[in-house]
């Protein structure tokens, strides 16, 4: 075949497209198991972080298996629909939050460590200023007091909304309460400068008002779904 012809050029280009596509597809398939494993490890690290257990990618799985003694899926009525630990871990909040509340799967992770006691860990997911925000809230044995919290984000502004992931912002959540003395669900409300004296409120991130409001909505929308479960567990 004449290598200078248009036909040759077309065939050569077509073959190269097929070859490159095949290589990229193979690479993607080869990397996917590792990418999935990394996501699993990161999620387990974040669950542990909500109960103040420090972990690394190397020991996160071991610590998760040791301290997360049980995992449940409950519904909005507070009923347990599954106690399969693996199934609970795989629940995708992004998908679940798009469903009607009546059919939504609500994951609960049960932590227990000698000297610390049992805590419930609840995942949360919502919207920040520039993209999704998410995290985990751990509850004391009274099922109304927050033991710990961890939040993360996809694209909030560094130094502003991104501060929701920093330890300084997270620390004041410990001891906050999502039910009042009468047992009415309050969640946590966004305030400016007075949250330290209010057990049902948190301070906004300086310069990150939109992200803070998104966090407030995330806590309200997600934690309210667990109201009956938390009350039945007391």
Predicted regions and their residues:
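Flexible, solvent-exposed loop/hinge segments and secondary-structure transition points
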Residues: 2-234
């Amino acid at each position: 075949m004449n290598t200078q012809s248009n036909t040759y050029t077309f065939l050569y280009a077509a073959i190269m497209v097929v070859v490159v596509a095949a290589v990229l597809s193979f690479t993607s398939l080869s990397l996917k198991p590792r990418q999935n494993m990394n996501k699993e490890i990161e999620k387990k690290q974040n669950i542990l972080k909500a109960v103040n257990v420090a972990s690394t990618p190397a020991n996160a799985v071991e610590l998760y298996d040791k301290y997360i003694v049980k995992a449940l899926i409950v519904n909005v009525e507070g009923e347990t629909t599954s106690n399969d630990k693996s199934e609970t871990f795989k629940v995708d909040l992004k998908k679940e939050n798009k469903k009607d509340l009546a059919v939504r799967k609500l994951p609960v992770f049960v932590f227990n460590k000698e000297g610390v006691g049992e805590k419930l860990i609840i995942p949360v997911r919502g919207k920040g200023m520039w993209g999704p925000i998410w995290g985990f809230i751990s509850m004391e044995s009274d099922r109304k007091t927050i033991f710990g919290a961890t939040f993360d984000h996809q694209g909030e502004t560094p130094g502003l909304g991104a501060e929701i992931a920093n330890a300084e912002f997270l620390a004041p959540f410990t001891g906050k309460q999502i039910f009042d003395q009468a047992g009415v669900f309050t969640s946590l409300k966004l305030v400016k400068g007075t949250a330290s004296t209010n057990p049902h409120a948190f301070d906004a991130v300086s310069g990150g008002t939109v992200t803070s409001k998104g966090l407030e909505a995330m806590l309200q929308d997600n934690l309210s779904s667990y109201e009956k479960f938390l009350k039945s567990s007391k």
